Amino acid sequence: MKLRFLSTLIVLLLGVKAATAQTNMQVFYDFGSDRKFVTMTLEMFKADKWGNTYFFIDHDFNYTDNNGNKDHCAAPGGTYLEIARCFNFWQNTKLAPLSLHAEYNGGITRNYPISSAWLVGVDYFLHDQSFRNTLNLKALYKNIHRTSSKVPMQFTAVWTCKDFLGLKCLTFDGFADFWWENHGCDFQPDGTCKEKRTVFITEPQLWYNVGDLFGCENLNVGTEIELSNNFGSTAGFKCRPCLGVKWVF
């Protein structure tokens, strides 16, 4: 669950005079057949005169003890972090939509670590005249610790559509990632697995600002659908729907 509102907030780069920060928290229940647990995400975006900083932390409440007993309320069973910095020293020029991008990813699940990854590249920002519809496109060199890949690259798209389909308070946003990574999936008891070389994941979200109805614009309710191929330890295509709430601080 990443980059939920980056493409919306990056418009601040075009006119911000002082540092501006936005933070939100999302709580989702994942209905995926191999999930069925709660994930909490904390996000922060801050724009400044040199660009912007973004990070999120996911906590999966899927803890299982050594005897295989599920105790999801005891503690997070997995945690994942992404932190990214866009450098843009030319915000008042025609090159303002183009930024240099640096990023770190890493975490751990209840079964295996998520290897540290370092990414560097470029980010290009597109928008309509109102800035209510935005798109970020990223081309990144990706180095994953102790992992090989045929092409050490990741391509990312991040989008936001405010007042989606002309409906006030409805927002459609999300991201899509594609990268190369040699990794094992569908591990069997005898230790065998399927070898995969690419990964794709997208998480479109639909949010309704229900709080606007009673004077509390912080509160949103909505849905997310994770669509992935060879993501994590699961081979092939997977669809995992979620329902959740978001509070914008």
Stretches found by the model and what they are:
Residues 4-15:
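Sec-dependent N-terminal signal peptides
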Residues 19-22, 50-54, 88-99, 126-135, ...:
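Short loop/turn motifs that connect adjacent beta-strands in outer-membrane beta-barrel proteins
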Residues 21-65:
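Short glycine/proline- and aromatic-enriched beta-strand/turn motifs that initiate or cap beta-hairpins
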Residues 27-33, 59-63, 102-110, 126, ...:
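Transmembrane beta-strands of outer-membrane beta-barrel pores
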Residues 36-40, 75-81, 114-120, 149-155, ...:
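Residues that define the transmembrane beta-barrel architecture of outer-membrane proteins
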Residues 42-46, 83-87, 120-126, 139, ...:
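Residues on the lipid-exposed face of transmembrane beta-strands in outer-membrane beta-barrel proteins
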Residues 66-72, 111-115, 148-150, 184-192, ...:
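Outer-membrane beta-barrel translocator domains and adjoining extracellular loop/strand segments
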Residues 142-220, 227-230, 247-249:
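Outer-membrane beta-barrel transmembrane domain signature
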